[in-house]
C-alpha cells in the first residue's frame, strides 16, 4: 500500500472515483456485458488526469464489491496508453495487419480492435491455430491486404517509424507470397477453392488422353486395344424381319471423336443408338474415360451432319456391299449401251467413237485400281498402307467422313460404268461387222480400194 495523499480533498476525490468505478463494474457484471476495453479507456483517461500522482488501482474494496478481473494481456496493471499495439506485427501467426478491412484512418477504434484481437489470439498456443498458416487455402484471400497498401497506410495516422515496421521485409509473413501467387493464378484463369481444403488443379491445354492415335495403337500415352468391342448397335436400314446388329469397336468410337467429324456426346449417342436420358451424356463420357477416350462437355462438331453420320461403319460397309451387288447384277448396262449406240450410226464416226470408249475404259480401270488400294482402317481391321502418305491421307479423310461407305460405293458405280463400256464396245464391233457385210453386198469387198482401206484402218 502506498502512503495516503497529503491533501484531504484529493483523498476524498480518489475514494469517490473508486466507488463509482466499482459500482459500474458491478452493474456490468450483473448485466453480462463485457466492457474491458471501455473500462480500460476510462482508467487510462483517469490516470492521465491532473491527479496522476494517485496510487495504482490496488485498493482493497469492501465486502460488497469484488475486485475486478481483467483477462490477459490486461491483468498486469497499470495500463499504459502509450503501449505499442503493433508489437505483434512481426509474428508470422498474426493476421491483424493483413485482415484490416479499412486502409485509413488508423485511429483509436483500430487500436481498440487490435487490442481485442490480440487478447483473443495471444493466449492460445500456436499449435492450436492451424488455420492461421499462410499455406491454408481456407484463408479469406479477398480481404488480404497487399504490401503496397501496407506501405501507403503508413502515411495515414501511424506513429513515426511505424511504416518501417509494416514494410514487406519487416512483415516476414509466410503467406504473402502465397497471396501473390493466388491472385496471379486467379488472373490467369485458374480457380482455387477459398473455403475448402481441396484445391482445383489447373487443366493443361492438351489433355493427357488425346484423341489422336498413332500407328502403334497407343491412344493418349496409354495402350488401348482398338479392336475391342465397345457395344453392339442395331441397324437403322434393315427391315423388322431381318434386323441385324453391328459390333462397334473402340477404334471406331475413336474415329468418330477424331477429325474430320469430332462428334459431340449428343451425336455420338445417336450413332450408338443410346436412349436419351437426363444424364446420358455424362454416363457416356464416364464410360469413354474408362477405355482411355476423352469426350469434353460442350464440344462442337467439326463436320456437317449427313445421313451417313448416323450409320456405324459395319452398316455403312454393308450398305456399300449391297449397292455394289445391285450395280453388278441389276444395272441395265446392255440396254443403255444399245440405246446410245443407235444414236451414233454414222460409219465415219464408228472408229473414233470406239477409240473414246477404249480410252474411257482404261481411265476407269486406273481410277478403280487406285481406290482398291485404299487402306483406311474399317471396323477392327488395321491394314498396312501401300500408297504414298499424301494420297492415302486424302482417301482416309473421305472414308472417315462417310464411315467407310464412300470408296466402295464409288467402286460399285465404276463397275456399272465399266459394264456399260464393255457392252458399248461389243455393240461397236457388231456395227463394224454389219457395215462390212453391207459393203460386200454392194461391191465394196476386201478386193476393192474402199474395202482395203477400211480393213487396213481396222487393223
From Swiss-Prot:
Q: Where in the sequence does UniProt note compositional bias of the Basic and acidic residues kind?
A: 450-459
UniProt cross-references to InterPro entries, sorted A to Z = TF_AP2, TF_AP2_beta, TF_AP2_C
Q: In which tissues is it expressed?
A: Localizes to neurons in areas of the cerebral cortex, cerebellum and hypothalamus (at protein level).
Q: Which residues carry this modification: Phosphoserine?
A: 258
Q: How does it assemble?
A: Binds DNA as a dimer. Can form homodimers or heterodimers with other AP-2 family members. Interacts with CITED4. Interacts with UBE2I. Interacts with KCTD1; this interaction represses transcription activation. Interacts with CITED2 (via C-terminus); the interaction stimulates TFAP2B-transcriptional activity.
Q: What is this protein called?
A: Transcription factor AP-2-beta
List the GO biological process terms.
aorta morphogenesis; collecting duct development; distal tubule development; ductus arteriosus closure; fat cell differentiation; forelimb morphogenesis; gene expression; glucose metabolic process
The record describes its post-translational modification as: Sumoylated. Sumoylated on Lys-21; which inhibits transcriptional activity.
Q: Where is this region: H-S-H (helix-span-helix), dimerization?
A: 299-429
How is this protein induced?
During retinoic acid-mediated differentiation. Up-regulated by starvation and a high fat diet.
- Record function comment: Sequence-specific DNA-binding protein that interacts with inducible viral and cellular enhancer elements to regulate transcription of selected genes. AP-2 factors bind to the consensus sequence 5'-GCCNNNGGC-3' and activate genes involved in a large spectrum of important biological functions including proper eye, face, body wall, limb and neural tube development. They also suppress a number of genes including MCAM/MUC18, C/EBP alpha and MYC. AP-2-beta appears to be required for normal face and limb development and for proper terminal differentiation and function of renal tubular epithelia.
Keyword check for Signal: no
Keywords for the protein's UniProt record, in alphabetical order? Activator, DNA-binding, Isopeptide bond, Nucleus, Phosphoprotein, Transcription, Transcription regulation, Ubl conjugation
According to the UniProt entry, the cross-link of type Glycyl lysine isopeptide (Lys-Gly) (interchain with G-Cter in SUMO) is at: 21
Location in the cell reads: Nucleus
Quick one: a GO cellular component term? Answer: nucleus
The primary gene name is Tfap2b
Provide ranges: composition bias, Polar residues. Answer: 35-51
Listed Pfam families = TF_AP-2 (PF03299)
